[in-house]
Amino acid sequence: MPRKKTTDEQSQIALFQAPEVPNAFRKPVQVIHSKPKTSLSLLHRKLANAWLKNASDTPSDDGWWTIHTATMATDIGFDSNNRAYLIDSARALMGIIFEWDVIAPEGKRKLWKASVLFPEVEIRPDTIRYQISRPLREQVLTPEMYAMIDLNVLKPFRRASSLALYEH
C-alpha cells in the first residue's frame, strides 16, 4: 500500500498541535481563600503554586522540599536570569502572613489562625529548598477540600488579579 505523502509544512504543524499534558495539583481551599496581609504579586502566586505542587508530588526530606530552579522556571513561565528578583520574591513570600478561615463570618468562626505558609527558603545555584509551616503541612499536603490548579494554565497570565480569579 503506498504511503500518503505529507509536505514538510504539514509535518511541522502536526508537531505543535499536540495537546499539552496537564500539570495539575490539588490546592487546598484554605490557601485559596486565605487572606494575605499584604498583596501577592504574580510571581509570588506562581512561586507558591509551584512549591505547593512540588510538595504534593515529592516526599519531604525532614520537612524540606527541593525543586530544581530550571524545572520551577519552566513550570511558572519564569524566563528571566535575574536571580536577585527571584530571591526578593522568595523573601517577600516568606514574610506574607495568611489569615485562615476567612469565608466564615467573624462572629461564627470556630478558630482564627494566622501564619506564614513558607517559613524558610534556601536558594542555591540550581535548586530551591523550602519548608511548609508545620501546623499547616497536613492541610496543605492532603486537603479534604481543594481546587485543581494547572500550572500550564497559569503560565500565560500577566497579572496577579487574573491568576487569583482563575484560582477562585
What are these regions (language model features)?
Residues 1-168:
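Charged, alpha-helix-forming regions
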